[in-house]
Design a protein with these regions (language model features):
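Short, basic-rich loop-to-helix N-cap that marks the start of a DNA-contacting helix
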Residues: 39-52
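Short C-terminal boundary/hinge segments that cap the last helix of small helical domains
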Residues: 55-66
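Recognition helix of helix-turn-helix/homeodomain-like DNA-binding domains
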Residues: 28-42
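Helix-turn-helix DNA-binding elements, focusing on the entry/boundary residues of the two helices
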Residues: 19, 30, 44-47
């Protein structure tokens, strides 16, 4: 599913988190989280982990596909 990488990065900035810190909250690797943000795609499971780590609803970080 498509994710809004810009929104995620803005949320990270607001929370003073870098990719490594976000990855730690998600119990994932920094490289994997970085790759997800670069690609702009993630599985539903990863979207849920990102949302939980950023304390937002998953719908706030996904892009609706056309």
């Amino acid at each position: 599913m498509k994710i809004n990488s810009v929104k995620i990065k803005m949320l990270m900035l607001e929370r003073d988190l870098n990719i490594g810190e976000l990855a730690k909250l998600m119990k994932s690797s920094r490289q994997w989280v970085g790759a997800i943000l670069d690609r702009g795609h993630a599985t539903l499971n990863m979207v849920n982990k990102i949302a939980k780590a950023l304390e937002v609803e998953p719908k706030e970080i996904i892009k609706l596909e056309d």
